[in-house]
Amino acid sequence: VHLYGSAANLNAIKKIIKKNSIFLIDDCAQAHGTIDDSNTTYNKKIGSTADISCFSLYPGKNLGAYGDAGIITTNNKKFYNMIKSLRNLGSTKKFIHDHIGVNSRLDTVQAIILNKKLKYLKKLNLKRRKIANLYNKNILNNKITKLIYSKSCVYHQYVILVNEKNKFIKYLQKSKIQYGFHYPFAIHQLKVF
């Protein structure tokens, strides 16, 4: 997962999976346009080197549709055929269903919207970087921990850590500063787990 738009160290991950014959499934949901800066010999975008790459195009993403949408990419023909079938109710041919699948076909309206918005992704990511740089320069309080992001981070979220959360929230509210919680709970704290 390239959390908050910051590239994970794919070089290190690929070394581990190569030794263990594991496929790499790349969660690119928050990293549209991020460069893999763990490998300095090439400047490939996140999602272009894994066995399977998944992109969420939920409206709140850096590249978002107007409704739920997503993309899966692969250069493996076997994976491609299975994914194509699963996203079309398990169908391999018209009226032939070999698998249990779901209706996950991207509709034409969402495709048109995304195609138009894609043209602005680079420009919008640059704007996010400029804003993040302003935060980095101006958040000087040593009680606020700023995360360390990759060089090509596209800042899906700008995240900070604070010890006295409730006190900090009151300060933000009093100062009329907008804030939010991206992940209010760790996944292992949820009832399902």
Question: Where do the PLM segments sit?
Answer:
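Active-site phosphate/pyrophosphate- and oxyanion-stabilizing loops and adjacent acidic/basic residues
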Residues: 11, 44, 68
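A cross-family glycoside hydrolase active-site/sugar-binding cleft signature
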Residues: 27, 56, 182
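PLP-dependent aminotransferase class I/II
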Residues: 1, 6-15, 19, 31, ...
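Active-site PLP attachment segment
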Residues: 48-82
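Proline-centered loop/turn at the N-terminus of a beta-strand
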Residues: 21-23, 52, 178
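Short gly/pro/ser/thr-enriched loop/turn and capping motifs at secondary-structure boundaries
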Residues: 30-32, 63-64
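Radical SAM/AdoMet-radical enzyme domain recognition
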Residues: 35-52
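Hydrophobic residues in beta-strands of the RecA-like P-loop NTPase core, especially within AAA+ ATPase
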Residues: 1, 25-26
